[in-house]
A protein has these predicted regions:
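Glycine-centered tight beta-turn/hairpin loop motif at sheet-sheet or coil-to-beta transitions
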Residues: 18-20
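Long, contiguous binding/interaction regions
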Residues: 1-14, 23-41, 45-111
Length: 111
């Protein structure tokens, strides 16, 4: 079990495990911090929208929300759905932000 906490003012994201171990990630927004966390703990499945392969923030969404919201897209569909990255999700998850970027690029070409 672990607890994830954030600080919008920095922005930073911290994970604290039940054994007391703690790691903190700071970057330009919370989505990027979450990507760093997922990369380091790639053996853990994070059950949230921010881990879904077809979810990635736009620059504007990132700036306006500090990275807490992103767009969920579907191939061939120009409509993108705004989602909160820590909302529950269990399908099509990845810990590799590069896979999310590749999906986003393929989606852009599909519309």
């Amino acid at each position: 079990m672990a607890t994830i906490e954030y600080d919008r003012s920095i922005p930073s994201l911290s994970i604290t495990f039940s054994n007391g171990a703690k790691r903190t990630y700071s970057d330009t927004d919370i989505f990027i911090c979450f990507g760093l966390l997922r990369k380091e703990f790639s053996d853990i499945t994070f059950l949230c929208k921010g881990s879904k392969i077809n979810v990635y923030p736009s620059a504007m969404a990132s700036q306006m929300s500090s990275g807490f919201v992103a767009y969920e897209v579907e191939m061939g569909d120009p409509e993108a759905k705004l989602v909160r990255i820590f909302d529950y999700e269990e399908n099509e998850l990845t810990n590799d932000v590069n896979e999310q970027i590749l999906y986003r690029n393929k989606w852009a070409k599909s519309i």
